[in-house]
Amino acid sequence: MTDTLFEYDHILMRSEYRTPDIHSHLALHLIVGLGGGLHCTVAGDNFDANAVFIASDILHTAYSDSGEMLVFLFDSTSRYAYEINRRFLHGDSHVCLDSDRVQKIRSLWKAHQDSICNADRAILEYLCLSKNSDLQLDERVAEVLTILKELDEVPDDAVNYLCGRVCLSKSRLSHLFKENPGISLSRYLAWEKMRKGYIHFQRYGNITEAAMRAGFDSPSHFAATCKRMFGISFSEYTKS
């Protein structure tokens, strides 16, 4: 079973999926084993941990023998991601949390598991992760992110559309994205399309409707992108 909270800048899942394929995506992870430890592979390193932060765009997989995990995915352009990089990762591919922090997160989940929203808030507050960081984005990049947030879909001509809205050439806008927040615009658009697909699935409960509304060519394209980005099939994600 998978319980999911969708916020625009992050996702929290209580998952029971097992052995996802090795994959990478633009989100930063926090993965916490609820019923025991995790078996992790990150950037080619195999290790066991109880909880781990994983940087953006790093090949990884993690699973628990019990199957039950808390899985956070933080948008790499968000203030949460900025704080995680600044306070925990320090440029590394991953960092494991100490036992005291893990036990506190587990206890917070147990205390709030009847409300995933309350659990999310309590855990982020405990880790001192705040939206109110001193992250500074180029104003044109910030405008693009706002425009994308307001769109229901990511169209095929999204780059041209965004360039027109912010009065920049393709090369200039792509350069700004690569410079700040440090990711490829085309890859971010693919991530954004995936996110909108999940949002529409939550809203309509139908993969065909979700795929079409998000801008995918077909439901199979949506499902294949899910498998590639997250290492699990869409059917595994939707089991509940």
Question: Positions of the model-derived regions?
Answer:
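N-terminal regulatory/effector-sensing and dimerization cores
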Residues: 1-89
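Helix-turn-helix/homeodomain-like alpha-helical modules used for DNA recognition
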Residues: 1-2, 15-20, 220-225, 229-230, ...
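Localized chelating/binding microdomains
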Residues: 51, 62-63, 73, 139-141, ...
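Amphipathic alpha-helical segments enriched in hydrophobic/aromatic residues interleaved with Lys/Arg
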Residues: 83-150
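Basic, amphipathic alpha-helical hairpins
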Residues: 112, 128-133, 143-158, 177, ...
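Append "Primarily bacterial transcriptional regulators
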Residues: 160-168, 173, 177, 210-217, ...
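Short coil/turn motifs that cap or connect alpha-helices
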Residues: 169, 184, 217, 232-235
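Terminal helix-turn-helix DNA-binding modules in bacterial transcription factors
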Residues: 179-217, 223, 239-240
